């Protein structure tokens, strides 16, 4: 709340000697600009191996045994993976049984992205992963790149103009997944 931020600002602006603060922030929520302006920002990205290691420690299980290898990217965060598992557990979805295409189809057909912003963000990441995998295995790289570029523009416009994601995802499914 605003009172807590004001108290934190006062402490940060007038610290005792030899006292340093490390503030850890989740990007899903914004920090007030007045607090952010007094901070040095370090963006930390984990390697794939480190991400898996951290996730395994948090879960107490091996994440690689719970999710199909096609659903992993080098850009997953432990939070992404845990959110994906929580989502799957709530809906009793066995992520080990779904290929990337099958999982994309499931998310779109059941409109899970409408009820959960995290799932919408994961769906967008899975769409990018789909294009990357398709690009890596195809001989017609220009076609895949053009489709990818077209959908990036559509995603950007959907965000920019606050358009409906349903039509975007249905178009992706009909033109790209089934096309």
Predicted ranges, named:
Residues 6-22:
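Conserved catalytic/switch belt of AAA+ P-loop NTPases
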């Amino acid at each position: 709340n605003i009172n807590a931020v004001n108290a934190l600002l006062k402490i940060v602006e007038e610290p005792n000697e030899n006292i340093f603060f490390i503030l850890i922030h989740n990007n899903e929520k914004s920090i007030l600009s007045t607090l952010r302006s007094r901070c040095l920002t370090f963006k930390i990205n984990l390697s794939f191996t480190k991400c898996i290691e951290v996730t395994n420690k948090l879960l107490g299980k091996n994440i690689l045994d719970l999710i199909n290898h096609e659903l992993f990217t080098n850009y997953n965060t432990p939070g992404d993976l845990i959110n994906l598992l929580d989502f799957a557990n709530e809906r009793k979805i066995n992520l080990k049984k779904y290929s990337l295409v099958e999982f994309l189809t499931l998310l779109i057909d059941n409109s899970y992205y409408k009820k959960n912003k995290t799932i919408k963000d994961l769906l967008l990441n899975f769409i990018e992963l789909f294009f990357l995998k398709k690009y890596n295995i195809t001989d017609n790289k220009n076609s895949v790149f053009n489709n990818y570029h077209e959908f990036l523009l559509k995603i950007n416009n959907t965000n920019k103009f606050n358009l409906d994601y349903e039509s975007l995802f249905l178009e992706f499914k009909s033109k790209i997944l089934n096309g």
